[in-house]
Amino acid sequence: MGAVRTALVDALFAALPVALVYFSGWAYLTSYLGQFGIDATQFDVSFTTVLVYAFVPLQSCMVLGAIAVIVVLGFIGFLIEFHAKEDSKGVRTVAASFGLFAVVLVVVLLFIIKAAATTAARDMSDNVWKGEKSQSVVPLVDPRKDDPSVKLYNACRDGRRLRQVIGLPNQLFLMCRSAVDECNRGTLFAVSSEGKILYSADKVREEINVRKICQP
């Protein structure tokens, strides 16, 4: 029974870091895309892409501090149980208490990561609206000149108002900032890897009436 328990604990500790990193990346990605009304579940996002974005919220001081506390408590619990060679009920109870507290902190850590991801995603979306993110121009393949979305796209391109939201292997999301209210309003374009406009949608920045991100 002890060997089974040890194997389960080892498996948990081995999988936990990967699960937390993946959760961090997915929380950031969904929050960031949600700022533009994009549902991340509607298209394929590779595992490596999620892992890359995971390091944005993981750099938060609150997240790093919580992780450090969990590691220290888990290590202390391990040392207590490791040195309890005899079947000391009191010592094992203390070790179990440390382990339980560490599990509770892991749950709390999920909420901390989510909060950090939301804050980082909002800051990154502000960079798009302020025009501080990279400008991207995707040539359209055989565009219909009379299509209103094509005309708007070309006007945005010529006015250097296109900013990349995110680039994926099969499509690219671009934000055309409004020529009148560039920090708050615009048009979102989804462009395929073949250079075709999949759809376009008018967008208004979230918290437009709460936060001003550009000087008047």
Regions found by a protein language model. Name each.
Residues 66-83, 126-131, 154-170:
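Alpha-helical membrane-embedding segments
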Residues 2, 80-82, 89, 111, ...:
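Residue-level marker of intrinsically disordered, low-complexity segments enriched
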Residues 1-98:
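N-terminal first transmembrane alpha-helix
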Residues 115-136:
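Alpha-helical transmembrane signal-anchor/signal-peptide segments
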Residues 88-122:
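Internal/C-terminal transmembrane anchor helices
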Residues 133-216:
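Extracytosolic and intramembrane catalytic regions of membrane-associated proteins
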Residues 51-54, 98-112, 131-151:
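Cytosolic juxtamembrane regulatory segments of multi-pass membrane proteins
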